[in-house]
């Protein structure tokens, strides 16, 4: 891929290129220009002739009239057109000689494109992402939002494209699907350009990192961690070089000022003037990246009794999402709830904060505890006409506007933003408001349901560090692998039948544990036996 500005090569060799930058830096816009969805204001994009480009569609309703399998095969537009034209010819009642010639031509092209393997290849992608075989002939309109995301991702991956563009491919994917995608991309031989806020994902799949800052792209031959270390080292080296140059400039200026009027030293002064003119300080323009300051400080230390849950059960729409759940929390527990059963996790969190009643069982918070809750669906929180400042003030014991604005400032809301109406905030801004609310509460128990959704990488990093330092108890769920691994010291997984696995361990150790895999396998075997019966 080349840009017309100086015919600069953006991608010269196959590999996986991670495109990073602050929110608003232009990552998604750049991908849309590469894919032809947007026209550039200046210049153009040249792709090597004969190469096929595929990209992840963002419109989840575009294919509602088609089957799941057809939607995936549409990832190779020409192959799908051949299939449909071929089927239309064979369906004719009056099949002519011309139809026979055309059908023969199509069959030849179809065979060259491995058309006979198309359905099985599409099915393999769907199964890998967690779309079971019995859904492959369903209409897209009948699928859930998360299932549609997986189908559209399979569409982008279908047919071994030469260039693959993925904008936030891990959004709304469960962890098994993310792991499958990681392995797929690691083994993918062609070019991938991916935008993601998932640091673990970028580290695992990317061979190169392209950093967008102030409209310019800087390419690094390494993954996200390599970029982070290299870019910081480069800034450090530039600062040191500038310091030496500034010292040299001062030395030359002093000599010139002292001896420029001295006849015997005039030649030396002139020489130093030329030397001074040649010294150029490196441009140290600060990055457009901004990190919020996230610091949860409990008003009260937690006692020994934190939370006791006994025999908790809940059925929703005829499905038992929680089945006899029991556990006890200690005062230093940071619990990550993992697995594909997201409804069960959200239900448990809602019960624990009093928004929902269990069908059976009970729970009890310790007398020294206070809870702050981050809901997955925050619509109700912002369904009002309050300004940001007034919205946060209602949750603060101290009603002083300056005090409240201090918390907003830490979350990248400058003074003038305080008069914005919360109803019109972006997804990321609403998340930062909710985190401000949790900080100002002084709670010693934090319950967070998918807090990393809608956040940029800088905010995720800041939240990650804030939770690591937090001296209280945390219950949370997230699809960000590194976020879970670095925050949690205990893992709970609610299985599809509503029962739970509970293990004091890190996330990576949990995934690698044969014992945990065996428990899941026993559950799957029992489910299959029940289905057979």
Q: Language-model features: where?
A:
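ABC ATP-binding cassette signature C-motif
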Residues: 1-242, 295-533
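Proline-centered turn/helix-capping motifs that create local helix->coil transitions or kinks
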Residues: 117, 264-268, 278-288, 364, ...
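Intracellular alpha-helical coupling/juxtamembrane segments of multi-pass membrane proteins
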Residues: 230-283
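Conserved catalytic-core segments of large NTP-driven translation/proteostasis enzymes
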Residues: 292
């Amino acid at each position: 891929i080349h840009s017309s500005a100086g015919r600069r090569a953006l991608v010269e060799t196959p590999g996986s290129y991670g495109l990073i930058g602050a929110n608003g830096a232009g990552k998604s816009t750049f991908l849309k220009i590469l894919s032809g969805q947007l026209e550039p204001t200046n210049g153009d994009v040249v792709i090597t002739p004969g190469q096929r480009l595929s990209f992840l569609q963002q419109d989840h309703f575009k294919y509602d009239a088609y089957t799941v399998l057809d939607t995936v095969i549409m990832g190779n537009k020409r192959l799908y057109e051949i299939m449909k034209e071929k089927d239309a010819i064979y369906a004719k009642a009056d099949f002519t000689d011309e139809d026979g010639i055309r059908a023969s031509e199509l069959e030849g092209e179809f065979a060259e494109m491995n058309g006979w393997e198309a359905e099985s290849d599409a099915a393999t992608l769907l199964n890998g992402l967690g779309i079971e075989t019995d859904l492959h002939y369903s209409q897209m309109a009948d699928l859930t939002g998360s299932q549609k995301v997986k189908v559209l991702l399979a569409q982008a991956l279908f047919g071994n494209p030469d260039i693959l563009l993925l904008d936030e491919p891990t959004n709304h994917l469960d962890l098994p699907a993310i792991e499958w995608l990681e392995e797929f991309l690691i083994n993918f031989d062609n070019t991938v350009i991916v935008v993601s806020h998932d640091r673990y994902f970028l580290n695992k799949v990317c061979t190169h990192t392209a950093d967008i800052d102030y409209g310019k792209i800087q390419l690094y031959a390494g993954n996200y961690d390599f970029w982070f270390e290299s870019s910081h080292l480069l800034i450090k080296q530039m600062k040191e070089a500038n310091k030496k140059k500034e010292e040299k400039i001062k030395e030359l200026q002093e000599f010139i000022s002292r001896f420029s009027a001295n006849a015997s030293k005039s030649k030396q002064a002139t020489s130093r003037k030329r030397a001074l003119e040649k010294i150029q300080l490196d441009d140290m323009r600060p990055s457009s990246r901004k990190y919020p300051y996230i610091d949860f400080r409990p008003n009260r230390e937690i006692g020994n009794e934190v939370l006791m849950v006994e025999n908790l059960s809940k059925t929703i729409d005829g499905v038992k999402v929680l089945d006899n759940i029991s556990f006890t929390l200690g005062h230093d527990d940071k619990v990550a709830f993992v697995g594909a059963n997201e409804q069960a996790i959200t239900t448990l969190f809602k019960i624990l904060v009093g928004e929902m009643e269990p069908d059976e069982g009970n729970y009890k918070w310790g007398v020294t505890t206070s809870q702050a809750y981050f809901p997955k669906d925050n619509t109700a929180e912002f369904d009002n006409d309050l300004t940001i400042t007034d919205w946060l003030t209602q949750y603060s014991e101290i009603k002083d506007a300056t005090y409240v604005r201090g918390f907003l400032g830490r979350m990248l809301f400058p003074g003038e933003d305080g008069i914005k109406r919360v109803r019109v905030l972006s997804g990321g801004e609403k998340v930062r408001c909710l985190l401000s609310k949790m900080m100002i509460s002084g709670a010693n128990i934090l319950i967070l349901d998918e807090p990393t959704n809608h956040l940029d990488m800088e905010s995720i990093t800041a939240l990650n560090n804030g939770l690591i330092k937090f001296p209280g108890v945390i219950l949370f769920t997230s699809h960000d692998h590194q976020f879970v691994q670095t925050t949690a010291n205990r893992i709970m997984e609610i299985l599809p039948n509503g029962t739970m696995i509970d293990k004091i361990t890190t996330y990576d150790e949990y995934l690698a544990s044969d014992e945990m895999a065996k428990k899941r396998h026993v559950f799957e075997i029992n489910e299959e036996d029940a289905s057979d019966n």
